[in-house]
Amino acid sequence: MDSVPAQTHQGFKEAGAASASHLTTTTSLPTKVESRTAVMEALEDIVYGSAAGIVGKYIEYPFDTVKVRLQSQPDHLPLRYTGPLDCFRQSIRADGFLGLYRGISAPLVGAALENSSLFFFERIGRSLLYSSGFAPRDSELSLSALWFTGGFSGAFTSLILTPVELVKCKIQVPDEPGGAGARQRQLKPIPVIKEIFRHEGLRGFWHGQLGTLIREAGGCAAWFGSKETTSKWFRGRNERALLKRGASQEEVVASRERPLPLWQQAIAGASAGMSYNFLFFPADTVKSRMQTSPIGGGGDNGGKGAATMMPKKSFGEEARALWKQAGIKGFYRGCGITVLRSAPSSAFIFMVYDGLKKYFPMA
């Protein structure tokens, strides 16, 4: 997943203050200036967050391909891959290194859509909390409130991500598992989209929605919680260091308005990405298995053929089948490589985003 940068929280706080001042100001000019500031903050969040997410996607995508291939190994056959390194070797031997980037066009679009949606719905979640009187508009939200707004944002974003990830998974795992009759699916997004629509209609694009919902709602809540907790710890540490050097109280207060150093933002982002990926990885595994099943059918038929005639499995049915076949370990295939790649990927996303905000401000 692509992360939501910390500086947006200050932007939302300023936007809330702007809304509150609109109720008391007697002239139109200050309101226009403040409204424009809030709009430009939101625009920066969306544009720069999307750009950072796309860059991050290029970094993490080969690891994501390996993860999906590990997750989607068939129930009734011996495992194709003994682990991430073996999957890397076999994949590069079969398709070359660029084969690990198969299907990246849809996720690149998804990275931009995901970030834009996260910012938009997170803002709505904050507005709901402020409107309900949960917190004054000129104050920062508590960590528990940020968990809520993150989960709220992730839940709505999952509706956008499920079709994108469905197409991505179909392309990343192109061969039908098992035996004779396996065919090579066309490895371009448009043909895959047409095939899904022809066999399953519009509803078919949301196959695996429950898994995406669990992963995104829970994952985004964990993202905000981990990110803000780590950032808060760093701010306290920095303030104590200032006081130890003899800084005045005014200097300490002023330091709270400045963004954290990039390396601290990177660590906070890395911890958030690792929490997001680890905590709800089993739901992502079940989703990947659902989304790599044959188009028009529900996956293998126990090696008896006629796979495409089998009905699609629900989330619960797929989870039970995986538990029966591999136990708890089956739900964590590819987890290690996913958590490890999420640390540098999330850190890089934050560094790109904050660099763009600092050197190319829109307002």
Curated annotation (Swiss-Prot):
Annotated signal sequence range: none
GO biological process: L-arginine biosynthetic process; mitochondrial L-ornithine transmembrane transport
Location(s) in or outside the cell: Mitochondrion inner membrane
GO molecular function: L-ornithine transmembrane transporter activity; transmembrane transporter activity
Principal cellular location given in the protein's record: mitochondrion
UniProt keyword Ribonucleoprotein present: no
Biased composition (Low complexity): 17-26
Annotated segments matching region Disordered: 1-26
Keyword Transmembrane annotated: yes
Keywords recorded for this protein, A-Z: Membrane, Mitochondrion, Mitochondrion inner membrane, Repeat, Transmembrane, Transmembrane helix, Transport
Membrane disposition: Multi-pass membrane protein
Gene3D superfamilies, per database record: Mitochondrial carrier domain
GO CC term, one of those recorded: mitochondrion
InterPro entries for this protein: Mitochondrial_Carrier, Mitochondrial_sb/sol_carrier, Mt_carrier_dom_sf
Transmembrane segments: 40-56, 109-125, 141-161, 208-224, 266-283, 334-353
Pfam families, per database record: Mito_carr
Segments annotated as Solcar repeats: 40-128, 141-233, 260-359
Ranges of compositional bias, category Polar residues: 1-10
Physiological role: Required for arginine biosynthesis. May participate in the export of matrix-made ornithine into the cytosol (Potential).
Homology family: Belongs to the mitochondrial carrier (TC 2.A.29) family.
PANTHER family the UniProt entry points to: MITOCHONDRIAL BASIC AMINO ACIDS TRANSPORTER-RELATED (PTHR45624), MITOCHONDRIAL ORNITHINE TRANSPORTER 1 (PTHR45624:SF31)
Designated name of the protein: Amino-acid transporter arg-13
